[in-house]
């Protein structure tokens, strides 16, 4: 599929396995998580630098011009949504017990995933102003909690801002990388 570049694929796989094995030996904290994710991105970047024409040969040759932006778009979705959940969760861990937020099991995780996906989408379609409506809607829905419980309110605000910031950063990063390909 990569035009005979099995060694590049093997190097990428070994790089990711090495990062994962090292990460298992380090206590899980926000900085160790972010470092691990950065290391995975470095592995991908190293493969791209090592063999920038990987899609120019083999089965994917006819689609090479489309695949690069699509790979960045999908990588950005994964980074903004799935990588963002654990990052925000680890950031918020010290305050979780004090906030004592009651609600459905995993609802915060699902809400965060959906809000990061919406923010990423709004950035990618060139409508980041729509994020203001998302902030307003979430504020209205959380108004009662905010007026009742200051700790829970602060917990939600910090988590929301971290989640929004994460998605915005990945959205604008993906948008910039795609623009560089043009």
Describe each model-derived feature in a short phrase.
Residues 13, 17, 82, 86, ...:
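Transmembrane alpha-helix boundary/anchor motif
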Residues 170-182:
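Juxtamembrane boundary at the C-terminal end of a transmembrane helix
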Residues 2-15:
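Transmembrane helix-loop-helix
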Residues 19-49, 53-124, 141-166:
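Interhelical loop and helix-boundary elements at the membrane-water interface
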Residues 12, 122, 132:
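Active-site beta-strand/loop microenvironment that shapes enzyme catalytic pockets
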Residues 132-139:
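Re-entrant/interfacial helical elements at transmembrane boundaries that shape
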């Amino acid at each position: 599929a990569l035009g005979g570049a099995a060694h590049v694929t093997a190097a990428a796989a070994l790089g990711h396995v090495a990062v994962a094995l090292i990460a298992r030996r380090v206590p899980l904290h926000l900085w160790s998580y972010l470092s691990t994710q950065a290391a995975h991105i470095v592995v991908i970047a190293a493969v791209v630098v090592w063999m920038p024409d990987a899609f120019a040969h083999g089965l994917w040759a006819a689609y090479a011009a489309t695949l690069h932006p699509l790979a960045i778009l999908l990588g950005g979705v994964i980074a903004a949504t799935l990588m963002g959940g654990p990052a925000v969760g680890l950031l918020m861990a010290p305050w979780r017990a004090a906030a004592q937020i009651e609600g459905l099991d995993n609802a915060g995780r699902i809400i965060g995933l959906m809000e990061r996906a919406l923010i990423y989408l709004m950035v990618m379609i060139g409508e980041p102003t729509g994020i203001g409506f998302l902030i307003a809607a979430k504020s209205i829905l959380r108004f009662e909690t905010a007026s009742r419980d200051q700790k829970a309110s602060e917990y939600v605000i910090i988590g929301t801002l971290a989640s929004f910031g994460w998605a915005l950063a990945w959205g604008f990063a993906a948008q910039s990388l795609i623009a560089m390909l043009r």
